[in-house]
């Protein structure tokens, strides 16, 4: 299996590069390796796709963070597979601008002067999950707004009894040719905005747009293992195409609430588990919480604060690979704030055995007063020793 080149090296940017710097670097490489300007270079298409793959990761904050931490393994399966160069321009059209692909003659790739059919716009909704819902998967009711075909004109934009007419500027192609020095650039028609048609008598309800606002409500399935910042795609649930093409998609942006016990790190869960001094010193069998209920864990004698035990398979499933992470139990020894007299006595005996220096026993305030007014006599033998020294 061939080793992949570092994405930062592919785009020729530093690891600290900003999103804007990544965008500029990708545009530069896209122009350099575009197949239409490198017809005699068979490797140009491969380099173009390699740059696109690198850009798709480094331009996305979540994918970039996983790549920085785990390398290519962290984003395996997270990038799109593009059939041809035109698919790339469909995906990153906003970055290049409307006429970028046609600048290199991309229009001929779609059958000469045919008008390009555009997808409908994508929409978004926000979904908040508990950690348990994210781990197991769930069904959620979502509400979002989108534009749909006008129910009065059926999306034509024209009033009843009239029909859209062919655009006189572009001849129905949706695009026009503009000269820029020795270059001829094909761009979206400014008159019909790429639709290829003009509305003579607009619909009174939608005012010629062919769409109307809608509040969409649906129940969606959230797959197990999603993480904060991920997106769930609802294909075809976006807005309609202005050209009769496919609808856009709805993307559900996932937000996962913090848990009061567990902290998530990728597919692993981290739990800080308190145990007593006696349990740490002598060993114990304790019950630790998991998302599936209590789990029995054996703590060997002499366990130190900070030791981590791994409970296999009690983490979060990876929605791409299907592998399940682990529960990492981090031990810390909890020191009691209050001790009974017996507990204090036993601990002092232990300290004496270990030759540990500890604070003396507390003396009550009344004992201190009694000692102040009636101090104890000096120990016998102290005075005679001084006398002997004087002599």
UniProtKB/Swiss-Prot annotation:
A zinc finger (CR-type) spans 137-215. Zn(2+) 2 binds at residues 167, 170, 189, 192. GO terms for biological process: chaperone cofactor-dependent protein refolding; DNA replication; protein refolding; response to heat. Zn(2+) 1 binds at residues 150, 153, 203, 206. The keyword Cytoplasm applies. GO terms for cellular component: cytoplasm. The J domain is necessary and sufficient to stimulate DnaK ATPase activity. Zinc center 1 plays an important role in the autonomous, DnaK-independent chaperone activity of DnaJ. Zinc center 2 is essential for interaction with DnaK and for DnaJ activity. This is Chaperone protein DnaJ. The gene is dnaJ.
């Amino acid at each position: 299996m061939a080793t992949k080149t570092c994405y930062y090296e592919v785009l020729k940017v530093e690891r600290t590069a900003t999103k804007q710097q990544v965008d500029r670097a990708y545009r530069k490489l896209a122009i350099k390796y575009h197949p239409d300007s490198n017809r005699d270079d068979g490797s140009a298409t491969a380099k173009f796709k390699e740059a696109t793959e690198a850009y798709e990761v480094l331009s996305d904050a979540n994918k970039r963070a996983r790549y920085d931490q785990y390398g290519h393994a962290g984003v395996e399966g997270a990038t799109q597979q593009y059939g041809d160069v035109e698919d790339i321009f469909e995906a990153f059209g906003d970055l290049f601008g409307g006429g970028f692909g046609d600048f290199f003659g991309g229009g001929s790739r779609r059958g000469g002067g045919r008008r390009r059919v555009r997808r409908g716009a994508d929409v978004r909704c926000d979904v908040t999950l508990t950690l348990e819902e994210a781990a197991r998967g769930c069904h959620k009711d979502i509400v979002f707004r989108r534009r749909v075909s006008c129910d009065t004109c059926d999306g034509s934009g024209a009033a009843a009894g009239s029909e859209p007419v062919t655009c006189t500027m572009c001849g129905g192609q949706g695009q026009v040719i503009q000269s820029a020095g020795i270059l001829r650039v094909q761009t979206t028609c400014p008159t019909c905005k790429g639709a290829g048609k003009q509305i003579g008598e607009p619909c009174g309800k939608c005012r010629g747009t062919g769409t109307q606002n809608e509040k969409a409500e649906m129940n969606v399935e959230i797959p197990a293992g999603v993480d904060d910042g991920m997106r769930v795609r609802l294909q075809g649930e976006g807005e309609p195409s202005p050209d009769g093409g496919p609808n856009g998609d709805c993307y559900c942006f996932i937000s996962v609430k913090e848990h009061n016990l567990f902290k998530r790190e990728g597919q692993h869960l981290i739990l800080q588990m308190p145990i007593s001094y006696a349990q740490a010193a002598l060993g114990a069998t304790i019950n630790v919480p998991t998302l599936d209920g209590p789990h029995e864990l054996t703590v060997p004698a002499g366990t130190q604060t900070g030791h981590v035990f791994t409970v296999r398979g009690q983490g979060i499933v990876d929605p791409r690979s299907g592998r399940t992470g682990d529960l990492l139990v981090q031990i810390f020894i909890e020191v009691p704030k209050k001790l009974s007299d017996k507990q204090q006595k036993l601990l002092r005996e232990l300290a004496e055995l270990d030759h540990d220096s500890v604070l003396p026993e507390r003396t009550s305030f009344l004992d201190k007063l009694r000692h102040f007014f009636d101090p104890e006599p000096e120990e016998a033998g102290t005075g005679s020793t001084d006398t002997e020294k004087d002599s």
